[in-house]
Amino acid sequence: MKRIFYILALLAFMTVEKGASAQTMSVATNILDYACLGTFNAELSCPLSRRWSLTAGARYNPFTYRRGDPDRQFQMRQQSYSIGARLWPWHIWSGWWFAGKLRYQEYNTGGLRSPETREGDRFGAGCYGGYTHMLTSHLNLEFGLGLWGGLDVFKCYSCPICGVTLSSGKTAFLRPDDIMISLVYVF
């Protein structure tokens, strides 16, 4: 899966038009993802034309927390990879935008609201929208919301550490995603 992601990203970056050479790339990080139990995240963006950009992003959270007692363990571990495109009605990296993404996520969550833990893999596509406010010629502040759906292949356990399987299977999902307040640096 990672190999396919890298090949698609490489092919997409090779299609960049020469007319969009004033600003060649941006890197962004979603501040709200760090509040999600310390999820590291980054998104690279490359212009395809005046109104289109290609994005590739990743999220990573390896952390497990314990409240002084192994039975009170909780986590929201994940690794997630996405590739997509944004339409900018006015100009790239400024104003309103609409986006679509393909995404893969490997996750393990549990112990937050109940001792039940769920882990698995999600594959899907999403629709996103937002607004980018230019702070300086190289620094932007971005706000956005997203919705993604697809296939979830999962297992549920009775607690984060016991390993007793309650259920497993495949199911379709549709869920909110990418509540964004991002800092974007434009090169």
Task: Please state what every model-predicted region is.
Residues 1-25, 183, 187:
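Bacterial Sec-dependent N-terminal signal peptides
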Residues 23-25, 36-40, 75-81, 119-125, ...:
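Residues that define the transmembrane beta-barrel architecture of outer-membrane proteins
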Residues 23-24, 30-31, 111, 117-118, ...:
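Short leucine-rich amphipathic alpha-helices used at interfaces
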Residues 24-27, 66-69, 110-113, 162-168:
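Extracytoplasmic loops and strand-loop junctions of Gram-negative outer membrane beta-barrel proteins
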Residues 26-43, 61:
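Solvent-exposed loop/turn segments connecting transmembrane beta-strands
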Residues 33, 45-48, 173:
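Short secondary-structure boundary/capping segments within folded domains
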Residues 46-143, 182-185:
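Gram-negative (and chloroplast) outer-membrane scaffold detector with strong preference
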Residues 136-187:
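Predominantly the C-terminal beta-signal and adjacent terminal strand-loop region
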